[in-house]
Amino acid sequence: MVIEHLSDLPSESIDAPVAESEQAGWRFMRRLAEEWASGANRFDGAGEAFFAALIGGRVIGVCGLNVDPYTVAQGVGRVRHLYVLSAYRRLGVGQQLVGRVIEAARARFDILRLSTQNPAAQLYERLGFRRCVGAADCTHLMELR
């Protein structure tokens, strides 16, 4: 498996993650595909990045880094769209993807935030994120500096 920084995301490359996530009742992967296709979010702003985990050229997981759109504070990044195909979960793929996002975020951001409503919360906490209190748009954060 390799983790690559992507600047292009052909829609067919994430068909499997989009389909699997929708079967599980999650729409965020569909939103990722639509926003990339429309140009609304291609993770190409200052300090932003998008990573994919690949096996044999096949995307098995993704995770992105954006400037946090939910705050006006400077120096705040946001972890976006972490998804790993179910067959590859609990193998460290998500940990490696988020690790690359954290590494990229350290170059530009002071704080990294995210929002999750699923079991990935435990992964984020193991990686050093702590729970946000009193913020509707944030469940976890990490101070980078």
Residue ranges and their predicted role:
Residues R113-S115, E125, R130-R145:
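Conserved catalytic-core motifs of GNAT/GCN5-like acyltransferases
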Residues E35-W36, C63-N66, F109, G134-L141:
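Membrane-topology and secretion signals of cell-surface/extracellular proteins
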Residues A52, R58-D68, R78, Y83:
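Conserved beta-strand in the GNAT
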Residues R80, L85, R89, Q117:
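Residue-level recognition of the GNAT/N-acetyltransferase active site
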Residues M1-S38:
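Short amphipathic alpha-helix that is part of the acyltransferase structural core
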Residues A40-A52, R78:
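A short helix-loop-beta-strand connector motif used in the catalytic cores of GNAT acetyltransferases and
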Residues A105-Q117:
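Conserved GNAT acetyl-CoA-binding A-motif
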Residues Y88, G92-R100:
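Conserved acetyl-CoA pyrophosphate-binding loop and the N-cap/start of the following alpha-helix
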